[in-house]
Amino acid sequence: MKINVEFEAPTWNQVYDMLLGQTEKIRQSGFKPDVIVGVLKGGWFSARVLSDLLEVPSLATVTVEFYVGVAETKNEPVLTQRISAVVAGKKALIVDDVADTGKSLKLVKDHVLQEGAKEVRTATVYRKPWSAIKPDYCEKETSLWIVFPWETKETVRKIVEKHCDKRAINMETAKLVKAGLPQPLVERFLKEILEERDC
């Protein structure tokens, strides 16, 4: 784990509000997707919400593996599940939670275009300033490590897996609470994970 990782932890309601704002931007742009493509795992929640808000019932998935830990990635993203629907001749909106390096988003966009989509646009909730790709629609830019509400336990587990030192674990999980994750939830997950773990 990188030293001095700082976190941003939006709540469910904050993410939903950002997606409401994003819906308006998409509508105002005149883009009307035929299919929404959620990048699993991180983009699934946002894709499902945008499917509802934009009233686009056609929802597909694609899976990319890139992250191996908190603030840690593989050298390159790997497409592990091809798109789950036919997109040939359709307008596709690719949705992910964050454009960090931009490599995953580029990989998926290239894949969807290769599958014959006639137009592809991208949407993320967050974007990092160093991302190689600027999504067509993005709600917020940050340089912090984002912990979404749908990955709280996963994040706590990755912190524990990096440390056998209880003090280091407590310091890192305290930063999660400071960023806005509910303390009782972090403590619950920490207790569950530590009970399974033998350092």
Predicted regions: what they are:
Residues 1-199:
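PRPP-associated nucleotide enzymes
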